[in-house]
A protein has these predicted regions:
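Histidine-dependent nucleotide/RNA phosphoesterase domain, centered on the 2H-phosphoesterase fold
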Residues: 1-169
Length: 169
């Protein structure tokens, strides 16, 4: 069964630039695991493992929500979730995502699918296993275009164990 989440994808050039910027922080914390550019995204809601049929139903139900997605958003603040040891890029105005997040969550619930009930925090995960107590860091601010929500599946390579995300169509 696929393990899925609803997300907003970023343009490839933005992902490449963010990954490059994040790698510059490797000298601060060489043990951190940095997110590959192809895996950068903005999670709107985590669903978990569902059937392939339900994944297709949810993917189709997300398509009409494009109209609720802001045209663009600014990436540029660095933050950490210390408990989870996550380094992230913050977004502003984060509240502009509330309508699409609320509707995505409502759609998931209406379809009778599981939904992670953690509160939404607008961020893009740049690294995991990030240590504590590092000096403040900055990213160049970028205003990036957004498209509508899509359903993504987590795929683990059986040979390498590496995770990648692919869109459920």
């Amino acid at each position: 069964m696929p393990r899925v989440f609803a997300a907003l994808l970023l343009p490839h050039d933005v992902c490449d630039a963010l990954a490059r910027d994040a790698k510059a922080f490797a000298r601060i914390d060489p043990l951190a695991r940095f997110t590959r550019s192809t895996n950068l995204h903005l999670t709107l809601a985590f669903v978990g493992e569902i059937s392939t049929i339900d994944a297709r139903r949810l993917s189709a139900a997300l398509r009409p929500l494009c109209a609720l997605t802001p045209r663009d958003i600014t990436i540029g603040r660095i933050g950490t979730f210390d408990r989870q040891r996550i380094l992230y890029a913050g977004l502003s105005p984060a509240e502009s995502l509330d309508p699409v997040v609320n509707e995505v969550r409502s759609t998931i619930t209406q379809l009778g699918l599981p939904l992670d009930d953690k509160p939404f925090r607008a961020h893009i995960t740049l690294a995991r296993d990030w240590g504590r107590g590092h000096p403040p860091m900055t990213l160049p601010a970028r205003t990036v275009p957004l498209s509508g929500p899509v359903l993504m599946e987590t795929v683990k390579d059986p040979r390498t164990g590496m995770i990648r995300y692919r869109q459920v169509l």
